[in-house]
Amino acid sequence: MKMKKMVAGLSTAVFAFSALAACGGGTDNESTTDNNASSDNKPEKIVIWEDIEKSETTKEVAKKFEEENGVKVEVVEVQMTDQKDKLALDGPAGKGPDIILVPHDQIGTIADQGHLAPLSDESVLDTFTDAAKSAVMFDGQAYGYPKSVETPVLMFNKDLVSEAPKTMDELYKLSNDVKADGQYGFLALWDNFYFAHGVIAGFGGYVFKEDGGALDPSDIGLNNEGAVEGFEYIGKWYQEGLFPKGLVGESGGQAMDQLFTEKKAHTVMNGPWAVAGYTDAGVNLGAAPMPTLPNGEPIKTFMGVKTYALSAYTENQEWAEKFLQELTNEENALAMFEAYNEIPPVSALESNETITSNEVAKAVFDQATNAIPMPNIPEMGQVWEPMAQALQLVATGKQDAQKSADDAVKVIEQQIQANNQ
């Protein structure tokens, strides 16, 4: 396996909402799409796997596409988390789709396994944000059309907090001020690396070193001086009793949500996927970008991008790409946002009133400028568990930050080496 893979760089990132959602695309793709597919190779139909309960807009675009081009588009609902494994079985058997939907951080693994085809023309991605474009790059090639983005933001109860704090020092003071009343000023799942990454990166840590747009999995920065400082900062919130003891492990998310919906927590760090549950529970919800760290740096959250990718087994790539250019253009991306609150990484929509008037969507767009696409190279799979274990040791006070970070990196390096043999 190559030691350097093309991947999303640090780039202004994310516009998050509901754990994954949105859609992106071009504003005017007619001239491009007309050249991409010819009538000589027109198929009877193409098949796209869409996420469950989020296919109505796709079906509407498919109907219009068939009317205009004479190519039927069959839209099949398949749970997004199941599509990767299902393609591995159905694709080689000739029963798979032309297009699948996957989280961008799975692109490297699926492409390495031979199940994805790169785009024939990367220039069609120019209408997407830089962060979204970088997220779908792997090994020097583009592997999909960004549909939607997500990243954690600061959510607050407007009945308890009139205005979102701008700094973590403000949140630290608030947390201490309300502690005696059994309240929590701020809660976050910082024993989970997905959320903790923002702090660690903000202090100077990094997962894999970026080199000319490529990530080098042989250079891991999760135990450098900045990363250890991030570990120590995270541990401080637990050790000073500003986070409850139950905010560790698998039940941490449930505990945090309960405290927030019961008005015992003033603010939380969470993503768009949490919005429906909070509002249904009656929370007067506000949202803002994450506050800056004590060092003055932003919290550099992870960004995720739902991506429409092409099956390596398709015989209709030209027409599949033509459909995706239509599905992810500005008009249809906005329609998906209005239907499903999925935030589209389309540059032209950043100032669209429909999106800017939505407080959570705007917070995600703003946070995006400091977000980092999750590495999509296969080696990232070896990072999550060792980092979770290290963070939990720090959170529970069982081990200091330096040793926890060193041990985690050692395990990650060993696992990557073992998988590359």
Where are these regions (language model features)?
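Conserved N-terminal structural module of periplasmic/extracytoplasmic solute-binding proteins
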Residues: K2-A13, F17, A21-I107, P272, ...
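Extracytoplasmic/periplasmic substrate-recognition and gating elements
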Residues: K63-E68, K72, G140, T279-Y340
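Extracytoplasmic "Venus flytrap"/periplasmic binding protein-like
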Residues: K64-D130, M137, Y143, K158-S162, ...
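A structural signal for short loop-to-beta-strand junctions that line the ligand-binding cleft
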Residues: D90, P97-D98, L125-D159, Y184-A188, ...
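Hinge/lid segment of periplasmic solute-binding proteins
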Residues: H104-V153, E163-L174, A180-G182, G226, ...
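Periplasmic solute-binding protein
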Residues: G108-H115, A131-Y172, W190-L215, M303-L310, ...
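Long, aromatic- and glycine/proline-rich binding clefts that accommodate carbohydrate-like moieties
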Residues: A135-V136, A288, F337-P386, L393, ...
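Glycine-centered hinge/linker elements that transmit conformational signals in sensory
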Residues: S175, P217-L247
